[in-house]
A protein has these predicted regions:
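C-terminal capping/lid region of NAD(P)-dependent oxidoreductase domains
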Residues: 212-226
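Amphipathic HAMP/coiled-coil signal-transducing linker helices
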Residues: 28-45, 59
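Conserved long alpha-helical elements within nucleotide-processing catalytic cores of c-di-GMP signaling
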Residues: 46-69, 76-106, 112-116, 120-121, ...
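Short hydrophobic/aromatic beta-strand micro-patches
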Residues: 122-124, 163
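Hydrophobic/aromatic docking surface of two-component receiver
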Residues: 8-10, 125-127, 167
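Cyclic nucleotide signaling catalytic output domains
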Residues: 6, 111, 138, 142, ...
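The C-terminal output helix
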Residues: 19-33, 186-190
Length: 227
């Protein structure tokens, strides 16, 4: 009888260990899945996570009839900053900008780092172009706020291209290409230069302090795709 009792206790202990192992295995898999969708430097979505989020947002947009906006963001002159201050300070800048963007987002929005100095933000359920313009302007102001790198005050410029689903493309690749193209056009604009491009309907200017602490007018630029 005692042997039977011991065997029963051992079996119970084994069952508990198996259950604990399965729980830990499930948690480990969830952790791996989560990390596989995240940028290691900033903790925001990476390209893989970005694609999944944008495709889901576009599906909801088509199903429920609301607009989804894609903001494609490039940090201007980041290579020069990286060269002048070093990769460590470059990483600090990227993390700082990432956090600033996160702080300006709504709970329904998502952000991804696409690599290097490029970010993407998905804005769901946007009611109007004017609303997108307001959000984008706030993003530019936040990015251009001075930050300290190696005890020097540095401000950066950014260019943002905007595309809106469904009118600018119903597929992932089309929408991203429209937003990226609009960003590249914005990047070419100089201060006070008139706009005359297929995508452009708006330009936002942001005054900022340049990286050498002398007064200068730098520009954050936005194109909204209208194709």
């Amino acid at each position: 009888a005692q042997d039977y009792l011991i065997r029963g206790q051992l079996q119970d202990a084994l069952v508990h260990r198996i259950l604990d192992y399965n729980i830990q295995l499930k948690q480990a898999r969830e952790q791996i899945r989560h990390l596989s969708n995240r940028d290691t430097l900033t903790g925001v979505l990476n390209r893989v996570g970005f694609r999944a989020h944008l495709e889901r947002a576009m599906d909801r947009s088509k199903r429920y009839g609301f607009n989804t906006a894609l903001l494609y963001i490039n940090i201007d002159q980041f290579t020069n900053i990286n060269d002048n201050y070093g990769e460590s300070d470059g990483d600090v800048m990227i993390k700082t900008i990432s956090q600033r963007l996160v702080n300006k987002m709504r709970s329904t929005d998502s952000i991804a780092r696409l690599g290097g100095d490029e970010f993407a933000i998905v804005l769901e359920d946007v009611n109007s172009t004017a609303g997108v313009e307001l959000i984008t302007e706030e993003m530019l102001k936040s990015i251009s706020a001075p930050m300290l790198l190696s005890d020097q005050q540095v401000a950066v410029e950014a260019s943002i291209g905007v595309a809106i689903c469904p009118q600018d493309g119903g597929g992932f690749s089309d929408l991203v290409e429209h937003a990226r193209s609009a960003m590249q056009q914005a990047k070419c604009i100089e201060a006070m230069k008139a706009l005359n491009a297929p995508h452009s309907v708006m330009l936002l200017e942001i005054d900022a302090v340049n990286m050498y602490d002398t007064a200068a007018e730098n520009m954050g630029k936005v194109f909204i795709s209208t194709e």
